[in-house]
A protein has these predicted regions:
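Membrane-embedded alpha-helical segments of integral membrane proteins
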Residues: 1-7
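A structural signal for multi-pass alpha-helical bundles of membrane permease subunits
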Residues: 10-275
Length: 275
């Protein structure tokens, strides 16, 4: 009761400051909780396996030395090369730099995201703003395909890719995912909120249909575009099954496949694997 009575004695501005401080304290605690795994990963890459098992994060300052904290997971002092991390000679035949795998993953994730964004946004825009025969049947069919697990189509898709001759080619990864039913549904829902009056005014001013889509509609659904790009990029970046099946040349492998190979070779060298 005393605390409750004191709260009424505070000025509105003081109560607002207290509320703001409490809010920031809660957010800070949540941020620390979320960042803890990442901070542990960053600290682990600078430690040997023995030190990693002994200390959860960094060792005490009194024990900091080149033996407890070093760059051996990145740098081999004997050869003076970055072969601890950037070479995978023990997992695959030949020498392919780690940067090549990283570049392959970036290329596939970025290209697939851009292509999927273009076709999905076009499809969602058409389904939201145009009236044509069979429109709602297409929407129902599109929603139905979202309930089918992607791995269920793996065998027929593999057969199709093999007959086309796209095995060991990035086309096998880019073309099947060029349009996303989930993406078209999201953009359709976003485009429904765009007033038709803006589109009519643009048509009166002489804008083409594609210009309306590009210059009127897309800027208004920018939040949806950002969210879709983030989800699509992360999905393509973490893709493992399809690249592992279709890609056979070592220089075309992606980062998740190489990291999976590192699990076997570096199963007890957690520092190198985490790096």
């Amino acid at each position: 009761m005393v605390g409750l009575g004191l709260s009424y004695l505070l000025l509105p501005k003081q109560r607002q400051w207290i509320t703001t401080i409490q809010r920031y304290v809660v957010l800070l605690l949540v941020a620390i909780l979320i960042l803890s795994p990442f901070l542990w990963l960053v600290s682990a890459v600078f430690k040997d396996t023995d030190v990693l098992m002994q200390y959860a994060f960094l060792p005490p300052l009194s024990e900091w030395s080149s033996e407890t904290l070093n760059l051996k997971n990145f740098y081999n002092p004997e050869t003076e090369e970055l072969d601890s991390l950037f070479e995978a000679e023990k997992t695959i035949e030949g020498e392919v730099h780690f940067w090549r795998y990283l570049a392959n993953s970036l290329f596939l994730a970025s290209t697939s995201t851009i292509v999927t964004l273009f076709f999905s946004s076009l499809g969602g825009y058409a389904l939201a703003k145009y009236e044509f025969h069979g429109k709602y049947a297409i929407i129902s069919f599109m929603l139905g395909t979202m309930m089918i697990p992607g791995l269920l189509l793996l065998a027929p898709l593999y057969n199709l890719i093999y007959k086309i001759g796209w095995m060991d080619s990035y086309w096998a990864l880019l073309v099947p995912g060029a349009s996303s039913a989930f993406g078209m549904f999201l953009f359709r829902q976003a485009c429904l909120s765009v007033p038709n009056s803006l589109m009519e005014a643009a048509r009166i001013d002489g804008c083409s249909e594609f210009s309306i889509y590009l210059n009127i509609v897309m800027p208004l659904v920018r939040p949806m575009t950002g969210a879709f790009c983030l989800v699509s990029f992360l999905g393509n970046w973490n893709s493992f099954v399809y690249p592992n099946i279709y890609i056979q040349t070592q220089s075309k492998l992606t980062l998740p496949i190489i990291l999976n190979q590192f699990v076997d070779v570096y199963s007890q060298q957690y520092g190198i694997f985490l790096a």
